[in-house]
């Protein structure tokens, strides 16, 4: 559990503090715990209740490999000290994390969602703009500018193995690439079903 700091075993962390200033710091601590844990373990998704999902097959909907959908931990439930966070407080943490741009609420289809349709969260230990800059750097360093590259190649290709975005789910990759399109540095290509499948960066 080296990815979790000592404060994770501090019982009061799991009880919503009544004082607003204390609670603000408490929420900030939780956000740091989530971000650091997911970065260290390279986890992209968490469910609404805080369950960490180590799953790179959600985009394809594959259920053939049980190991691909292995649930490893619920961060808001610490069995070692018999403490858990209430769902009401979990929702408050997610809300603040979303405001800070450190997570992205998505629905079952992998699209950005409203509170009522959210089924899980993409965890952004880098901002969307930071991911976009890193991906742009890869295009420049690898000599791929002005070439059409599929999202699958970006996520799963051998040429990205040593880059932090390797194995990023394609539905998250879309949101990380969008800032490049907004800056007129990239164009997305879609298939006959209007799904983005590739990108050209200039």
UniProtKB/Swiss-Prot annotation:
Name the principal localization, coarsely classed.
Answer: cytoplasm
Whether Transmembrane helix counts among this entry's keywords is no
GO terms under cellular component: cytosol; ESCRT II complex
Subcellular location(s): the record lists: Cytoplasm; Endosome membrane
Sorted alphabetically, the keyword list is:
Cytoplasm, Endosome, Membrane, Protein transport, Transport
For this UniProt entry, the molecular function terms from Gene Ontology, in alphabetical order, are: protein homodimerization activity; structural molecule activity
- Oligomeric state and partners? Homodimer. Component of the endosomal sorting complex required for transport II (ESCRT-II), which consists of 2 copies of VPS25, 1 copy of SNF8, and 1 copy of VPS36. The ESCRT-II complex interacts directly with the VPS20 subunit of the ESCRT-III complex.
Q: Which family does it belong to?
A: Belongs to the VPS25 family.
Name used for this protein in its record: Vacuolar protein-sorting-associated protein 25
Q: Which organism is it from?
A: Saccharomyces cerevisiae (strain ATCC 204508 / S288c) (Baker's yeast)
Q: Which gene encodes it?
A: VPS25
């Amino acid at each position: 559990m080296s990815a979790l700091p000592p404060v994770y075993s501090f019982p009061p962390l799991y009880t919503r503090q009544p004082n607003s200033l204390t609670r603000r710091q408490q929420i900030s601590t939780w956000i740091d715990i989530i971000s650091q844990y997911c970065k260290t373990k390279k986890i992209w998704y968490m469910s609404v209740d805080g369950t960490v999902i180590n799953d790179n097959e959600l985009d394809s909907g594959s259920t053939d490999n049980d190991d691909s959908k292995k649930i490893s931990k619920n961060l808001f439930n610490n069995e070692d000290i018999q403490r858990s966070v209430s769902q009401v407080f979990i929702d408050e943490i997610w809300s603040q994390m979303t405001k800070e741009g450190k997570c992205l609420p998505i629905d079952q289809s992998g699209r950005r969602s409203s509170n009522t349709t959210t089924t899980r969260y993409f965890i952004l230990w880098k901002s969307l703009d930071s991911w976009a800059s890193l991906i742009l750097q890869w295009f420049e360093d690898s000599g791929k500018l002005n070439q059409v590259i599929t999202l699958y190649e970006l996520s799963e290709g051998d040429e990205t193995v040593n880059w932090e975005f390797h194995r990023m789910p394609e539905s998250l990759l879309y949101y990380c690439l969008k800032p490049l399109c907004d800056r007129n540095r990239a164009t997305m290509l879609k298939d006959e079903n209007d799904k983005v499948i590739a990108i050209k960066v200039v």
